[in-house]
Amino acid sequence: MAFFVKNMISNQVKNLGFGGGSEEKKEEGGTSDPAAAKGMTREEYEEYQKQMIEEKMERDAAFTQKKAERACLRVHLRDKYRLPKSEMDETQIQLAGDDVDLPEDLRKMVDEDQDEEEEKDSILGQLQNLQNMDLDTIKEKAQATFTEIKQSAEQKCSVM
């Protein structure tokens, strides 16, 4: 009961702003050492803090790397489709150290797209497009043109 009354009075004094409650905090809280609060020795707590800082740095580095990879992909797509460049993406790539490449899966997809585009631009790609046309019509036109040329040549040249 005495604790309850003492606690209520100290809270009222704190609210008034006289600052009489600072001594009570020390008595109630025990130590203000965070290591003791977590049940560790000082050395264990320092080692724990170092590990936490290292893990945070690794996570931040991985996050920055992922952001830079995404920015690299956006830059690649902007180049491919001739869109305006973004300063924000270039800044992200520079923050990561300029050694950023596309992720492996995306690189495979980009390579496949480039291969497909090269095939379409090549002669074989054009021939495959011709297969989609009506070959009978093309043959008839070619034969008609050939016979016309042959007839005009026979008329002009008496040797044939």
From Swiss-Prot:
State a GO cellular component annotated for this protein: synapse
Query: What cystine linkages occur within this chain?
Result: none
Cite the post-translational modification comment. Farnesylation mediates presynaptic targeting and is important for function in neurotransmitter release.
Q: What is this protein called?
A: Complexin-4
Superkingdom of origin: Eukaryota
Which stretches of sequence are listed as region Disordered?
A: 14-44
Q: Which GO terms describe its biological process?
A: exocytosis; neurotransmitter transport; regulation of neurotransmitter secretion; visual perception
Q: Which locations, inside or outside the cell, does it occupy?
A: Synapse; Cell membrane
Question: Which UniProt key words apply to this protein?
Answer: Cell membrane, Exocytosis, Lipoprotein, Membrane, Methylation, Neurotransmitter transport, Prenylation, Sensory transduction, Synapse, Transport, Vision
Subunit comment for this entry?
Weakly binds to the SNARE core complex containing SNAP25, VAMP2 and STX1A.
Please give the function described in this protein's UniProt entry.
Complexin that regulates SNARE protein complex-mediated synaptic vesicle fusion. Required for the maintenance of synaptic ultrastructure in the adult retina. Positively regulates synaptic transmission through synaptic vesicle availability and exocytosis of neurotransmitters at photoreceptor ribbon synapses in the retina. Suppresses tonic photoreceptor activity and baseline 'noise' by suppression of Ca(2+) vesicle tonic release and the facilitation of evoked synchronous and asynchronous Ca(2+) vesicle release.
Cysteine methyl ester sites (modified residues): 157
Gene Ontology molecular functions: SNARE binding; syntaxin binding
Which tissues show it? Present specifically in the retina (at protein level). Expressed in the outer nuclear layer of the retina (at protein level). Strongly expressed at rod photoreceptor ribbon synapses (at protein level). Not expressed at conventional amacrine cell synapses, nor at cone photoreceptor ribbon synapses (at protein level). Weakly expressed at cone photoreceptor synaptic terminals (at protein level). Not expressed in the brain (at protein level).
The regions listed as transmembrane in this protein's record are none
- Which residues would be cut away as propeptide? 158-160
| Residues bearing a lipid moiety (S-farnesyl cysteine) | 157
Which InterPro entries does this one have? Answer: Synaphin
Summary of the knockout phenotype: Knockout mice are generally phenotypically normal, viable, and fertile. Normal overall retina structure and morphology of the outer plexiform layer (OPL) and inner plexiform layer (IPL). Abundance and distribution of synaptic proteins remain consistent. Reduced inner retinal processing and retinal synaptic transmission at low light intensities. Cplx3 and Cplx4 double knockout mice are generally phenotypically normal, viable, and fertile, however show disordered morphology of the OPL and vision perturbation when compared to single knockout mice.
One Pfam family, short name: Synaphin
Q: Which family does it belong to?
A: Belongs to the complexin/synaphin family.
Membrane topology summary? Lipid-anchor
